[in-house]
């Protein structure tokens, strides 16, 4: 079984990826936050740095690309190939309203005729040795089109089909649709990867029991809260407080080298702590102070309070759903 770190916009960029790979070397593949295909087929700034092989030497990175113009996608693929990549992942899963309104992300699932034509042209024109995987949801407002959608995927040689069994309208709310995923599982001929609400080892094992032929599991928010989750799934030790603290220090240092200005850095670290804090569920005052911190000094004081006053309880999930 393969285990993947999901692409999470703004947070799973190379500073966090490298820190995670350094402390928890159990991930088979990391996926970059999505990059929008463009007419130039070239990227600068933080996207260029995030995709740079020099910034991803200790891990296997699969760039995720979003777009609906075949020519733009091909230019992005060429850019990636020049960097040494041999595969990209197509984003057909982003539920953001602004993205969907443009017919991108999960919005591409609306028109299967367009999608078929898009895939035909993409596979016809791309370099033969460049692999394409796809990450998608199971529909827009309902899952009634699962048979048509995944039969369509079967017509093309995707290296993997990664499925988050929610519809776009759910965003990340409610439960995943395991009945819907069962239908996908029965239809799909390409290698299939499960993604969605894996927050502990027990849930991962149940998914593998229910769907024994899947080729992998992709983890996102659960892995941000418990960076040792895949190690636990593989039968290793559960997360220890010291390694979490050391990991957080490494994340702080890595982002401080990428982000200019304490204000911007503080925003990023608060975002990270929305997940780290799940391991300190009773440290209510310290967590509130950290959220309100306006300077790095206040941030460090709040973090110290969380550590000194709050009991470390390794995160095991917020709900039982399977």
Predicted region positions:
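Flavin-dependent oxidoreductase catalytic cores
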Residues: 1-322
